[in-house]
Amino acid sequence: MALKQISSNRCFGGLQKVFEHSSVELKCKMRFAVYLPPQAESGKCPALYWLSGLTCTEQNFISKSGYQQAASEHGLVVIAPDTSPRGCNIKGEDDSWDFGTGAGFYVNATEDPWKANYRMYSYVTEELPQLINANFPVDPQRMSIFGHSMGGHGALICALKNPGKYRSVSAFAPICNPVLCSWGKKAFSGYLGPDESKWKAYDATCLVKAYSGSQIDILIDQGKDDEFLSNGQLLPDNFIAACTEKKIPVVFRLQEGYDHSYYFIATFIADHIRHHAKYLNA
């Protein structure tokens, strides 16, 4: 599978690159970012996947979070895909910011006209890791995942649906219980249809309640002044309650004065990289 390099920039001794490829799952051209730390020049490194939030491309995280310093320090290859298929010419794909383009929600759609292209779940859990493992100096056995908002939801469900696949998981302001919030209801009804029982397969709170896999340590940071926390889109309390009931270890940090933005992410990104490095470099 041919990769086309779009850009390459030296950063903290490593290289921040962006590539384009033709996705089999999504049936369109996709871009992803990959950071190769200095350690990747001499051997295989663990892989850490970042999933971005609504409206984002592969660019937001790599240009705003400043994660490269910590990734360089801990020797992690960090991969950041786009948030949806692009340019599929599906009627309505560009009509709203929270559905369609830039809003794939990391599910495999089952409804027309989305089901042929909107397969972000399989893309981030199967196709992209296979592509990364084949083309970059990563250790396929050492992989973790994290994300923000819609991407925090994506990271949590990918980890919970695949016990043992990821060494660790973390999230910034994740959409924790999408079956109960308006963003989730809109996306899931569009991509997965009206049967709400099918939605639960992509809801972190529902997945935790049924989880029986190997222990996974979860780190979540949430800004206390996040407008989407106060208006009921994120619902972290439901997720924490489910984790507590199932005795799944979760560190939940409510950060005073912080909002939903990349300023919040940039403040705590090094903590998250450290969290993953602890498991990936063990």
Curated annotation (Swiss-Prot):
The modification N6-acetyllysine is found at residue 200. The keyword Acetylation applies. The keyword Cytoplasm applies. Its EC number is 3.1.2.12. Its main location: cytoplasm. One of its GO terms (biological process) is formaldehyde catabolic process. Belongs to the esterase D family. This is S-formylglutathione hydrolase. The gene is Esd.
